């Protein structure tokens, strides 16, 4: 069993214990595939450019069915692991997402960004759904306040996943979408969440205030 745990991710066993790790993997397998989270110490602490608030940054990977592995970084207000907070998943390359996530965390929000690995919308959708499941299960994330933030080309993937998972995604944030969101929203009859369209031309400070009001 130790060799199996080492193969699928020994870090989870070291963080929560062998027995808990076995139980988590078994439960997930029975549910149609397993996922788990890995973290690499040490955590990095940075400051929000807008608020000056300290932000903890930690590498985190989510695993889905088969060989799917999605790697990224989670940003949260420093020293707030015991507090439930809304979470935003950024959908676009991390080169853009890291600054967004740092400022979102500075505004009191848990934020996660990652690089899509697969080609095509189907692969990107699968990766984002894996991240969504993982973020909803973080102990410091409020699973009833999870939002997807898409920017530019990432808007389509964010909208697709939000509309396909209406009970898991409480709201959709679109920054400079490359399509008319009304065209997609007409097809999203089951989606009960709200949609916020952000005009990036207004500036980051105004955008952050609008997003914070939206998720809180």
Task: Identify the function of each model-found stretch.
Residues 41-81:
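N-terminal cap/lid segment of alpha/beta-hydrolase-fold proteins
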Residues 107-120:
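Conserved alpha/beta-hydrolase
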